[in-house]
Amino acid sequence: PQVSGFITQLCVEEGQAVRKGQLLFVIDQVPYQAALQTAQANVEAAEAALSTAKLTLDSKKELHAQNVVSAFDLQTAENSWLSAKAQLAQMKALELNARNNLSYTEVKSPSNGVVGTLPYRVGALVSASLPKPLTTVSDNSDMYVYFSLTENQLLGLTRQYGSKQKAL
């Protein structure tokens, strides 16, 4: 898994056929939901701070044009606005990271196939540094088999099935 936590749901059984994107496991989502809500609140706060900084900058521009405030005050207001803009970008990036982490709590099948062994059960603590994977999904849609036959065996199979293609 890409996140750490306790397995809260095991949605498949060993040997079960699964489709690409099917849910296999759910890792405890509570801390990741809280982190996302915090990140969303931080984005809203950063948007408000940016709006306030923009109002202050616009006001300082007008006052500077009338020689009421110094160029230093204007530059300070502009720097505050740029800082608030950067803070908003940072908070949006943190929100995206929190959203991704929450999505990683749902472990889905990467392909169609069959579920292998399930070494971890509900309640097990899992993390990205585990030595064993949560499970493996074996894609068995294309299988190639190599074997050897004597000419007599091939001839016998060809006679039995009517053609070499059907025999193999």
Per-range role (PLM):
Residues 164-168:
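Short conserved beta-strand and strand-loop elements enriched in small hydrophobics
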Residues 2-129, 142-146, 152-160:
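Amphipathic alpha-helical coiled-coil/rod segments that serve as protein-protein coupling scaffolds
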